[in-house]
Amino acid sequence: MRKIDNLDFYRIIVSMGRTGSAKLTGDKLGLETSNVFRCLRQVEKELGAPLFDREKRPMQLTEKGRTFCSIAEQMLTLQNHLLDVFNEDVDEDEG
């Protein structure tokens, strides 16, 4: 499995896109800032493109970064919906 197949990585990148900050993302998700940057570097390496302009503060998404975050947000929404459907089924089966 490729590293970017991990939805946790998507969650990290989407959060960084919203906050523009690895530190705020780490605080929000309970991760060390260094691990947030490590995730970002791994995803960018596999995609072969930078997702953030690191020269600006707060960091800003590149065009490819905006595309990545848009699609990743949809995937995370679908994952949440899928889990909700199965949680409802479990509740009905137990009830």
Question: Where do the model's predicted regions map?
Answer:
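Short, solvent-exposed amphipathic helices
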Residues: 64-81, 89
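Alpha-helical residues within the helix-turn-helix
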Residues: 27-28, 45, 66
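Residues within the DNA-recognition helix of helix-turn-helix
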Residues: 32-35, 39-42
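Short alpha-helical elements of helix-turn-helix
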Residues: 1-19, 37, 66
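A short LG(V/I)-centered, amphipathic sequence patch enriched
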Residues: 44-61
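Interdomain hinge and pocket-entrance segments immediately C-terminal to HTH DNA-binding domains
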Residues: 88-95
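Short helix-boundary/capping micro-motifs
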Residues: 14-30
